[in-house]
Regions:
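Pyridoxal 5′-phosphate
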Residues: 1-284
């Protein structure tokens, strides 16, 4: 019997409800979201919005319309970083970041003239809040941290960093690729302004799904521009969410699969799933 251990890359197998729900949508509906007023399109609209609501509930986010769907956490992080940072801005980040953050920051350093401070980690991969505070400058625009390292699995003190960032009026972006679906995340109490997540890891959804939770009033410049299904005579991207940051046809089948996975997680309970995982690693 094969044993699959590559869950930090993507989880497998998915709950059976995920492929079943995707198949049912493709075979029995197939309509696209935001592109029509006929029955199948309206049904697709409703299904997509239900997944926004489920994600908002999972992360204790107040407005489902500002749960933005993307193709991956990499796109979500690029959307936030490229959409916010301007020439002269300073960013504080950790030494444990994935290339989805690091390469984007280095590109912005080269192309836009931002500056970057890297907060070191100790031998256990832990970051001290005092070191984060010491890295802040007058021109610091944003702090971006991974919640859990994809290499070490170390959990970073995002609640403390969120308190620090909010007290200094600095935006706080969290990369929750490895933690969403594993650890409790509350964008309100942890003071997270922007939360980037993927659907295909511990949220148990299909590849090609991800998102950005926008929990702030920041004007984020769209990463791409294009059709949104409405305001077609307007020459620029609409200024309201989610259309402001979503251009092109959504991955409706993938989003519906992610919704099925979220239903599974709600039924099982995150804490119950965590206990099972812990038991696997601690059983002699």
């Amino acid at each position: 019997m094969d044993v699959y251990l590559d869950n930090a890359a993507t989880t497998y197998p998915k709950p059976s409800v995920v492929p079943n729900r995707i198949y049912d949508y493709i075979v029995n509906n197939g309509g696209t979201s935001g592109r029509g007023a006929y029955e199948k399109a309206m049904l697709a609209d409703g299904l997509v919005f239900q997944v926004r609501k489920r994600l908002a509930g999972l992360f204790n986010h107040l407005d489902p319309k500002t749960v933005i769907f993307t193709s991956s956490v990499t796109e979500s992080l690029n959307l936030a970083l490229q959409g916010i940072l301007k020439p002269g801005d300073h960013v504080v980040t950790s030494a444990l970041e994935h290339n989805a953050v690091w390469r984007c920051l280095k590109t912005l350093e080269r192309d836009r003239g931002i500056s970057i401070s890297i907060v070191p980690a100790n031998a256990q991969g832990e970051t001290a809040i005092e070191d984060v505070a010491a890295a802040i400058r007058p021109e610091t625009r944003l702090i971006v941290f991974t919640h859990a390292s994809n290499v070490l699995g170390t959990i970073q003190p995002i609640a403390a960093i969120g308190d620090l960032a909010r007290s200094r009026k600095i935006l706080f972006l969290v990369d929750a690729a490895q933690s969403s679906g594993v650890l409790p995340i509350d964008v309100q109490t942890q003071k997270i302004d922007l939360l980037a997540f993927t659907g295909h890891k511990s949220l148990l959804g299909p590849m090609g799904t991800g998102g950005l939770v926008v929990n702030c009033e920041e004007d984020i410049h769209p990463l791409i521009s294009g059709g949104t299904g409405g305001d077609s005579a307007y020459e620029y991207q609409p200024d309201y969410y989610p259309n402001h940051l979503e251009a092109g046809t959504l991955n409706v089948s993938g989003i519906i699969g992610l919704g099925a996975a979220l239903e599974f997680l709600e039924t099982e309970g995150l804490e119950n799933i965590r206990r099972k995982r812990t038991a696997w690693w601690t059983t002699p």
